[in-house]
From Swiss-Prot:
It comes from the Bacteria. The gene is sapF. CDD domains: ABC_NikE_OppD_transporters (cd03257). Keywords: ATP-binding, Cell inner membrane, Cell membrane, Membrane, Nucleotide-binding, Peptide transport, Protein transport, Transport. One of its GO terms (biological process) is transmembrane transport. This is Peptide transport system ATP-binding protein SapF. Pfam families: ABC_tran. It comes from Salmonella typhimurium (strain LT2 / SGSC1412 / ATCC 700720). The keyword ATP-binding applies. Induction: Part of the sapA-sapB-sapC-sapD-sapF operon, RNA detected in mid-log phase cells.
């Protein structure tokens, strides 16, 4: 029996804004939700803009403090601000590597920084791990001396993946990480991520609006709307028999129909 790797219990986020001298407005960006993630499992979180999916991803990665709820990984609680502990277990890939990678640092510096900050590895050990990680994502050892702007778009996203992998995490969160790539590069990165999942035992949480991509990479899916989960289940079941109107609309917008067993096998 595969044990639960990540457990999310009643996690929520409410933003409070000052709208005047004596007035405040609250927005429930993420209403209390719960889910679990197993080893080597991929969970897709889909929804329209403003559904709360990116806010949820940032709470999981420790970038935003939850208003309420609990996070546990391997039965160990995660607390906001525990960056070193969390970053060795949960890492994130961002949508636009051009803005998330420091343009003034060489690739060697970008990958070395998390190792210096979160491990006790000696310089030579860090160098070996950097080279090994670059090879894992299809980059050459010679690329260590490059700056991000010297890489092609697909290579930049491979670097983003390498930065996520450098601490050998158990969970990688990808927030629309492949959305900006063309279909060929996107397919290459998907295949690479699936290969790494099999070899390294990584679990993914993939945040996306691209329901076609979700079909190919995810085992389970959460559908979010206005901060709450309106549908969940195995990807095959949700796509074949959607229950919520939003899910039906998203599927119809991409595939033109719910995915029956025959339609599932078609390459749309």
């Amino acid at each position: 029996m595969v044990e639960t790797l990540l457990e999310v219990r009643n996690l929520s986020k409410t933003f409070r804004y000052r709208t005047g001298w004596f007035r405040r407005q609250t927005v429930d960006a993420v209403k209390p939700l719960s889910f679990t993630l197993r080893e080597r499992q991929t969970l897709a979180i889909i929804g329209e803009n403003g559904s709360g999916k990116s806010t949820l991803a940032k709470m999981l990665a420790g970038m935003i403090e939850p208003t309420s709820g609990e996070l546990l990984i391997d039965d160990h609680p995660l607390h906001y601000g525990d960056y070193s502990f969390r970053s060795q277990r949960i890492r994130m890939i961002f949508q636009d590597p051009s803005t998330s990678l420091n343009p003034r640092q060489r690739i060697s510096q970008i990958l070395d920084f998390p190792l210096r900050l979160n491990t006790d590895l000696e310089p030579e050990q860090r160098r070996k791990q950097i080279v090994e990680t670059m090879r894992m994502v299809g980059l050459l050892p010679d690329h260590v001396s490059y700056y991000p702007h010297m890489l092609a778009p697909g290579q930049k996203q491979r670097l983003g993946l390498a930065r996520a992998l450098i601490l050998r995490p158990k969970v990688i969160i990808a927030d629309e990480a492949l959305a900006s790539l063309d279909m060929s590069m996107r397919s290459q990165l998907i295949n690479l991520m699936l290969e790494l999942q099999e070899k390294q035992g990584i679990s993914y949480i993939y945040v996306t609006q691209h329901i076609g991509m979700m079909k190919h990479i995810s085992d389970q899916v959460l559908v979010m709307h206005q901060g709450e989960v309106v549908e969940r289940g195995s990807t095959a079941d949700v796509l074949a028999s959607p229950l919520h109107e939003l899910t039906r609309r998203l599927i119809a917008g991409h595939f033109g129909e719910a995915l029956t067993a025959d339609a599932w096998r078609k390459d749309r």
